[in-house]
């Protein structure tokens, strides 16, 4: 997820190398030049069919399913136990994430979303077992999201390379899905030999949650933290709730070995939570300066920034 994703006219200022661009090739926006991110060179890539997703083995039976060709650089996670597997987010829905999952496991798969923004629920409709929070925000989003809302995600300036065959931006929309069961804060999901604790962490959205694998020291943070500009400016964002959620996660940092965020790179150090907690407190107190960027207040810190509405 990148700051320039906020600019509706980004295509007009996007730098494309005309001298090296061959006729008929997809345009390569400026942000494509940053790929691949250096962190991915240190990870074990797993070969899968198709060109839209890249899969990386993060830990035994923990896979990051990465969408590098779209501006948000969304990352979903497949966590495999002895009896079943859990898919934490389903990405943009541009290509079939289910096809990727079935290449990695033959076990039954339960879907749990870190929150219900469209870039994390695009593949939900491919699955029959979906557990989720019960909030008005999540119930509304389960009805699907129209092309009017999501089509900009596939605008040329937000795509690096080519879309999968048959995908048309003007037809792209998020299909509705059915929730099998509602979950609760503190609930444990037993996959068989691996238990995951659900932690409600509202703020980015009312239904944001994180997922803790306490035994292995892994915390899946969703959009509560990722290394990059963290979006906290949408109407559904509650910054006060966000600060409380961050404080909750920061208390876990000494027990953790790894953070697994939902954008950009799939591995971050737990110390980021301590720094994030200090950052949001400095924003609350007014002790840190900001810049105005594309109509938002941006508070910059080492390794991430916070984007709030300009009020």
Annotate each predicted stretch with a short phrase.
Residues 7, 16-18, 215:
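Cleavable N-terminal signal peptides
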Residues 46-47, 56-58, 79, 186-191, ...:
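Short acidic-hydrophobic surface loop/beta-edge motif
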Residues 85, 92-93, 172-174, 181, ...:
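Metallo-beta-lactamase
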Residues 49-103, 211-226:
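Conserved beta-strand hairpin/beta-sheet module of binuclear metal-dependent hydrolase folds
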Residues 2-9:
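Sec-dependent signal peptide recognition
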Residues 94-190, 227, 276-289:
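Active-site HxH/HxHxD metal-binding segment of metal-dependent hydrolases
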Residues 59-64, 186, 195-197:
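Short, hydrophobic/aromatic-rich segments at coil-to-beta transitions
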Residues 13, 18-46, 228, 244-311:
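Accessory terminal helices/loops
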